Amino acid sequence: MNKKNNLLVLEDGVKVILAPAKVNFGLWIKGKRPDGYHDIFSIIHTIDLYDRIYIELHYTLEVLSVGPFSKNLKDNIVYEGVLAFSRLTGKNFDYKIVIEKNIPVGAGLGGASSDLAAVISYLNEELENPMKEQELTDFLSSFSKDAPFFLKGGCALVYGTGDQVKVLEPISREITVVYPNIEASTSKVYGAFTKQTEEVLLLEDILRLLEENDIENIIENHLQETAIEIYKEIGELIRFLESVGYKPYMSGSGSSVYVFGKLSDKIKMALESRGWYVYECKTI
């Protein structure tokens, strides 16, 4: 096996791409735009929880899903994205693409967006990059506002509708992500969000605190209250973690919640006994 970045090549020629999850170190909503999207800014960081994507030559395009969070991907953005990329480039992509879904679905961890970015980036490189970076960003954002971030990963400030990305210095942290086994709908959470928000911190203050490595003291998620109103499991998880002395933060529009550091074995067992998933991760 050889490895280049997140691409592995197996002995039989099957390509394997590692598509990382992300967490939001805060999500601030500035208001709603005329086009229906929200203006936001957020600090996002990739973590070492991965979907594995297997790609090999095939007689036609086929996208399959396996793993603990597999589902029918015929209408998934990876399938639709490859078809659209094929139309734009005039190339047929006769590949069998198998996505091993290890990242929980509807968790606020960006799994589908990361998968899309990984596959389209790979296909673009196979064609010797007919799409330059901005074109690729625009293409990906037409499917998912999170997807452009995954072209580079690491740590970034995302703003606008989430499609504008400013790369930041990585933040080294151990975190534990807990998925309460409920698939939250991003559109449903954003659609239910009606509150007028006041920015507790200015963007300049957030960036300054990041430079001081003080990430824990800036995190705020304007969607958390709305998500809890829709999905009671998120609130139950947050209250449980608070009751045992941890400071939990919701990622994205939910449903996953994370804490900095590791949980005790006793707490992990208590969470898993409820059917919830616990992942010990590091930022990457």
Curated annotation (Swiss-Prot):
Record pathway = Isoprenoid biosynthesis; isopentenyl diphosphate biosynthesis via DXP pathway; isopentenyl diphosphate from 1-deoxy-D-xylulose 5-phosphate: step 3/6
E.C. numbers: 2.7.1.148
Please name the InterPro entries in this protein's record: GHMP_kinase_C_dom, GHMP_kinase_C_sf, GHMP_kinase_N_dom, IspE, Ribosomal_Su5_D2-typ_SF, Ribsml_uS5_D2-typ_fold_subgr
* Binding locations of ATP: 104-114
**Where does the signal sequence lie?**
none
Reaction(s) catalysed by this chain's protein: 4-CDP-2-C-methyl-D-erythritol + ATP = 4-CDP-2-C-methyl-D-erythritol 2-phosphate + ADP + H(+)
Q: Which keywords annotate this record?
A: ATP-binding, Isoprene biosynthesis, Kinase, Nucleotide-binding, Transferase
Q: Which GO terms describe its biological process?
A: isopentenyl diphosphate biosynthetic process, methylerythritol 4-phosphate pathway; terpenoid biosynthetic process
- The active site of this protein is located at 22, 146
Single Gene Ontology MF annotation: 4-(cytidine 5'-diphospho)-2-C-methyl-D-erythritol kinase activity
**UniProt record similarity statement:** Belongs to the GHMP kinase family. IspE subfamily.
Q: What does this protein do?
A: Catalyzes the phosphorylation of the position 2 hydroxy group of 4-diphosphocytidyl-2C-methyl-D-erythritol.
| Protein name in UniProt | 4-diphosphocytidyl-2-C-methyl-D-erythritol kinase
